[in-house]
């Protein structure tokens, strides 16, 4: 059983509705997924279902890897239902006419039915026109149901449902009323991560109750049941190359929590024991062979990170001893000398500063120009970048990556290196950089 919950565009209520549906059906076994590279929406899914949400992305993955990622996650969680939240509009991708990076591409790779979410504010018959347009653009995308969001009242809902069903033949399975309780707080990188929200569990509970009230969940399950067995080739997500036991310290707390679960599992599949630690709360690094500091919001917690002098000194000593550290985006910022003049680790002698506008927002293609912690010279890999910060004075640094698509740190270069350490604005996924875990764990052993 599987379904894609797609929108006609951004800000139509996908995350609230998808998370609410996941919560409402969680007792029946739901494995959540998110199309695209986003870290934050999946944190809501995970809290709603108790199962770790997985990202599926046709820029990061081949169709065969999409099928592998889906079936693998379903098997690991033992879930009956796979619910996939789309990204932006159903057909938005990296090209104005292509499929790559779109929700539609994932639906087709998985042969999954689609339920289209429409912001129906001030719409009646025009909602039917939207459904017809979305259905006719690509007949391989199976739009089997519609959810109307932002319904004014029951009369509005009934009129719009009639228009859609009679003019398009597509079932309307729910109408969600306008309500401030069905909104999610925003931040400069998107929604506020669930890890930061003390009240998020109660909020998700409300969303689940709302979906139980306003959506025909039995009809939704019938749509999910219409999906046949997934057919087609499957392909491994990452390389397996290291069999020597290593310990990898992974920074996980309020400031650093942007990790793809597959990255952690790829490390474990390459003989790593993952040891979580907190740059905010712990006094020093645990006993590990290498350190992985992912993305997050270090700029929001810069005061707390600066005040933990013992942890910063522990990281400085670890680096000075020649042991490897890998920092991604927020992790890169923490490894710099400062963030907005607040002292950080100083692994790299450059300050990071927040700006008032996006400095990088793109899918990325990069090529390694030298052997480094996670890739070898000549390797090409993919990822994404989304940040408002920039690194100052880094133009004379030593860089491991040439950025072929995207911006990087400076002058289309990324992956700044110092000793055994590497820091990059590029967020990688185990499938988009399949050599990542094998190289990282091997280098952790050798260093």
Swiss-Prot record:
Cofactor(s) the protein needs: Mg(2+)
GO BP: cobalamin biosynthetic process; methanogenesis
Gene Ontology MF terms in the entry: ATP binding; cobyrinic acid a,c-diamide synthase activity
InterPro entries in UniProt: CbiA/CobB_synth (IPR004484), Class_I_gatase-like (IPR029062), CobQ/CobB/MinD/ParA_Nub-bd_dom (IPR002586), GATase_3 (IPR011698), P-loop_NTPase (IPR027417)
Pfam families the record matches: CbiA, GATase_3
Domain GATase cobBQ-type: 247-435
Protein name (Swiss-Prot/TrEMBL): Cobyrinate a,c-diamide synthase
SUPFAM superfamilies (UniProt xref): Class I glutamine amidotransferase-like, P-loop containing nucleoside triphosphate hydrolases
Reaction(s) catalysed by this chain's protein: cob(II)yrinate + 2 L-glutamine + 2 ATP + 2 H2O = cob(II)yrinate a,c diamide + 2 L-glutamate + 2 ADP + 2 phosphate + 2 H(+); Ni-sirohydrochlorin + 2 L-glutamine + 2 ATP + 2 H2O = Ni-sirohydrochlorin a,c-diamide + 2 L-glutamate + 2 ADP + 2 phosphate + 2 H(+)
The EC number(s) this enzyme carries: 6.3.5.11, 6.3.5.12
Cited HAMAP family: CobB_CbiA
Keywords recorded for this protein, A-Z: ATP-binding, Cobalamin biosynthesis, Glutamine amidotransferase, Ligase, Magnesium, Methanogenesis, Nucleotide-binding
Role according to the record: Catalyzes the ATP-dependent amidation of the two carboxylate groups at positions a and c of cobyrinate, using either L-glutamine or ammonia as the nitrogen source. Involved in the biosynthesis of the unique nickel-containing tetrapyrrole coenzyme F430, the prosthetic group of methyl-coenzyme M reductase (MCR), which plays a key role in methanogenesis and anaerobic methane oxidation. Catalyzes the ATP-dependent amidation of the two carboxylate groups at positions a and c of Ni-sirohydrochlorin, using L-glutamine or ammonia as the nitrogen source.
Species classification: Archaea, Methanobacteriati, Methanobacteriota, Methanomada group, Methanobacteria
Signal recorded as keyword: no
Comment, domains: Comprises of two domains. The C-terminal domain contains the binding site for glutamine and catalyzes the hydrolysis of this substrate to glutamate and ammonia. The N-terminal domain is anticipated to bind ATP, and cobyrinate or Ni-sirohydrochlorin, and catalyzes the ultimate synthesis of the diamide product. The ammonia produced via the glutaminase domain is probably translocated to the adjacent domain via a molecular tunnel, where it reacts with an activated intermediate.
Family in the record: Belongs to the CobB/CbiA family.
Active site as annotated: 329 (nucleophile)
Residue ranges of the TM segments: none
Residues carrying the site annotation Increases nucleophilicity of active site Cys: 427
Domain of life according to the entry: Archaea
Miscellaneous information on this protein: The a and c carboxylates of cobyrinate and Ni-sirohydrochlorin are activated for nucleophilic attack via formation of a phosphorylated intermediate by ATP. CbiA catalyzes first the amidation of the c-carboxylate, and then that of the a-carboxylate.
Pathway participation: Cofactor biosynthesis; adenosylcobalamin biosynthesis; cob(II)yrinate a,c-diamide from sirohydrochlorin (anaerobic route): step 10/10
């Amino acid at each position: 059983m599987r379904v894609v919950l797609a929108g006609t565009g951004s800000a139509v209520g996908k995350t609230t509705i998808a998370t609410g549906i996941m919560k409402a059906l969680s007792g029946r076994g739901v494995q959540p997924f998110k199309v695209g590279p986003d870290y934050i929406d999946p944190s809501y899914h995970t809290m709603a279902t108790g199962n770790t949400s997985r990202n599926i992305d046709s820029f990061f993955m081949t169709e065969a890897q999409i099928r592998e990622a889906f079936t693998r996650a379903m098997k690991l969680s033992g879930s009956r239902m796979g619910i996939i939240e789309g990204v932006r509009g159903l057909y938005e991708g990296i090209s104005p006419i292509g499929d790559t990076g779109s929700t539609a591409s994932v639906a087709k790779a998985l042969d999954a039915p689609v339920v289209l979410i429409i912001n129906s504010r001030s719409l009646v018959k025009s909602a039917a026109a939207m459904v017809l347009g979305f259905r006719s653009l690509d007949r391989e995308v199976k739009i089997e149901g519609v959810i109307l969001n932002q319904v004014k009242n029951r009369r509005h809902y009934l009129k719009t449902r009639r228009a859609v069903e009679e003019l398009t033949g597509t079932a309307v399975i729910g109408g969600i009323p306008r309500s401030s309780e069905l909104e999610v707080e925003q931040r400069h990188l998107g929604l506020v991560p669930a890890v930061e929200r003390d009240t998020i569990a109660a909020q998700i509970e409300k969303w689940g109750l709302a979906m139980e009230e306003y959506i025909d969940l039995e009809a939704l399950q019938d749509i999910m049941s219409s999906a046949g067995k997934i057919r087609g080739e499957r392909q491994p997500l990452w390389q397996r190359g290291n069999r020597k036991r290593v310990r990898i310290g992974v920074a996980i707390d309020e400031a650093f929590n942007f990790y793809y679960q597959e990255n952690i599992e790829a490390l474990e599949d390459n003989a790593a024991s993952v040891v979580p630690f907190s740059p905010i709360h712990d006094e020093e690094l645990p006993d590990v062979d290498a350190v992985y500091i992912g993305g997050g919001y270090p700029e929001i917690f810069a005061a707390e990170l600066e005040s933990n002098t013992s942890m910063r000194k522990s990281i400085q000593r670890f680096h000075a001893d020649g042991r490897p550290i890998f920092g991604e985006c927020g992790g890169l910022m923490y490894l710099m000398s400062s963030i907005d003049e607040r002292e950080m680790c100083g692994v790299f002698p450059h300050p990071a500063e927040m700006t008032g506008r996006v400095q990088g927002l793109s899918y990325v293609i990069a090529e390694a120009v030298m052997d480094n912690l996670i890739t070898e010279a000549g390797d090409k890999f993919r990822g994404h970048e989304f940040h408002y910060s920039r690194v100052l004075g880094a133009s004379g640094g030593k860089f491991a990556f040439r950025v072929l698509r995207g911006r990087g740190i400076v002058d289309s270069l990324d992956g700044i290196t110092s000793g055994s350490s590497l820091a990059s604005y590029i967020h990688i996924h185990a499938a988009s950089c399949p050599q990542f875990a094998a190289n990282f764990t091997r280098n952790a052993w050798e260093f």
